[in-house]
A protein has these predicted regions:
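Death-fold homotypic interaction modules
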Residues: 1-98
Length: 98
């Protein structure tokens, strides 16, 4: 694992409590190309059965397993109008939503 990947996973773990109430995971799916169908299915099931807060935790867990998961997540947040959440994760605009 590269050092920046480790840092990205740490950021997701540390900041989850700060954004878990703001994210609706299935709204981000069109922009999260790193997720495989099984990931999306598990996240959607969690969102349907237990709500978006619990589903966000599953989303973060799945993102940490995927290459470029962090970058895709930050870009997806920006594309969906959640700039303030993206800034929590990427305050230096290393990953833009384009």
């Amino acid at each position: 694992m590269r050092s920046y990947e480790k840092l990205e996973k740490q950021i997701l773990d540390q900041r989850l409590k700060d954004f878990q109430y703001e994210v609706i995971p299935d709204e981000l799916f069109p922009f999260l190309r790193c997720l495989i169908p099984e990931d999306k299915e598990a996240i959607k099931a969690e969102q349907t059965n237990r709500g978006p807060i619990k589903a966000t935790a599953v989303l973060v867990d799945r993102l940490k397993r995927r290459q470029k998961g962090f970058q895709d997540f930050v870009k997806a947040l920006r594309k969906c109008g959640s700039e303030h959440t993206a800034l929590l994760l990427d305050p230096n605009y290393n990953f833009r939503g384009k």
